[in-house]
Amino acid sequence: MTRSEGDTWNLASSVGATATMVAAARAAATRRPRPVLTDEYAEPLVRAVGLDVFTKLASGELDPDDLERDVGFARMVDTFAARGRFYDDYFAAAGKAGVRQVVIVASGLDARPYRLSWPAGTTVYEIDQPEVIAFKTATLSRIGAAPTAELRTIGIDLRQDWPAALQDAGFDPAQPTAWLAEGVLIGFLPPEAEVRLLDSITPLSAEGSRFAADYGSLNDASQASTEQARRTTEGWRRRGLDMDIAALTYPGKHTDVAAHLGADGWATTTFGLADLFAAAGLPELTEAEQGPAATLSFVRAIKS
């Protein structure tokens, strides 16, 4: 089903299923002999969602190589592991710099407030759909997981007035903040909503604040991209999952996040997927392994 303004989803459908896919990839990466990252909460969260293909991937029942070939997404597990590690390292650097206020927008099934070692005095704010927040909180509570920082959750759609809800939860715009928008600005919001998100973050960011995100579009409407999306969608359907990649993203020219932040006074550094693989110690992607994420950019920024 094509995305529309104000649409809704859960973790088993539409864009929500991509959050479950990413968590399943983190669980699969955690099982490897020398994992790029360790996320012990990914598998129980994926199991609780109940999508068969992702449960099998997370549990080790399904060979990642077989799945990646079938859906046309080479090195999918490595890609999401490298991305996750990139942002884990970003938060570690922010903590060492003295930042004690963190905001994760559209957090999905990410469990960083539980799995990372945060400096004493850190408060983490998570923003996502109310149903997603409730599901994740309840699932982690059932398995006895406890946050490693003070955690405050805000159940609200990013297309609504989330800045007011964030401040109502105790967020202090006078304090430096480490922001993360992982997997958000890659076509899952309308272009105008991307701009609103960035324009809302800047005035809430004191000097010394940091921002990290990936950006671009998984489906740029080119013939090659359209064909890739078709093959991937057919692959997921063969695995019993109705996830139409092209229909998940909004059309239009999406935001150059680094340029937008730079114009607003942020000092930005951009990276490609190859940089993330190198930083994680993973073998580089071959020409044949260039998948949907290879066209994305990654940014880290500091507010001066």
UniProtKB/Swiss-Prot annotation:
One of its GO terms (biological process) is methylation. InterPro entries: Ppm1/Ppm2/Tcmp (IPR007213), SAM-dependent_MTases_sf (IPR029063), SAM_mthyl_Trfase_ML2640-like (IPR011610). It is an enzyme of class 2 (transferase). It comes from the Bacteria. SUPFAM superfamilies: S-adenosyl-L-methionine-dependent methyltransferases (SSF53335). Keywords: Methyltransferase, S-adenosyl-L-methionine, Transferase. It holds the Pfam family LCM. The keyword Methyltransferase applies. One of its GO terms (molecular function) is methyltransferase activity. Disulfide bonds: none annotated. S-adenosyl-L-methionine binds at residues 128, 157-158. Its EC number is 2.1.1.-. Belongs to the UPF0677 family. Exhibits S-adenosyl-L-methionine-dependent methyltransferase activity. This is Putative S-adenosyl-L-methionine-dependent methyltransferase MAP_0882c. It comes from Mycolicibacterium paratuberculosis (strain ATCC BAA-968 / K-10) (Mycobacterium paratuberculosis).
